[in-house]
């Protein structure tokens, strides 16, 4: 899961192309991981209006189509950011990391929890690209994180 200069150029050049036809013509693109490229193209299409700031960042990696379908929009993440209280926040369903990223702009310490390793890898890469250093990534199921916690009575 690496965005080389050639892969980024391929994605930009084929952003509006029919991805089924691209897949069928994979042999015409030696050196390109065509499945990964197509996933990135489809993800970028999905976020163009939903996440305009992220769409403008060519270096970001989208771990799956599902992650871009299920993530918060920038507007929603900014709204959630306004609701924050305190200096530490834990996002127990990290996913693509949209909420986590916007939480990190307000809170001093943010914990991103995600059970899928490829999402954690992408989040680590993306947070670095976005110059966000106050996020701690934990690869775990949210239930395992909250189970030892006890509620105040």
What name fits each language-model region?
Residues 1-153:
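SAM-dependent transferase fold signal centered on methyltransferase-like domains
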């Amino acid at each position: 899961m690496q965005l080389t200069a050639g892969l980024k150029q391929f994605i930009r050049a084929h952003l509006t192309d029919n991805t089924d036809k691209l897949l069928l013509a994979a042999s015409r693109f030696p050196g390109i991981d065509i499945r990964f490229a197509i996933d990135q193209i489809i993800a970028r299409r999905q976020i163009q209006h939903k996440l305009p700031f992220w769409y403008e960042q060519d270096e970001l990696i989208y771990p799956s189509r599902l992650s871009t379908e299920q993530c918060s929009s920038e507007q929603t993440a900014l709204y959630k950011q306004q609701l924050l209280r305190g200096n530490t926040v834990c996002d127990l369903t990290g996913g693509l990391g949209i909420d986590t990223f916007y939480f990190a702009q307000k809170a001093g310490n943010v914990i991103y929890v995600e059970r899928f390793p490829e999402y954690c890898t992408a989040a680590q890469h993306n947070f670095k690209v976005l110059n966000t250093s106050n996020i701690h990534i934990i690869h775990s199921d949210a239930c395992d994180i909250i189970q030892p916690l006890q509620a105040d009575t």
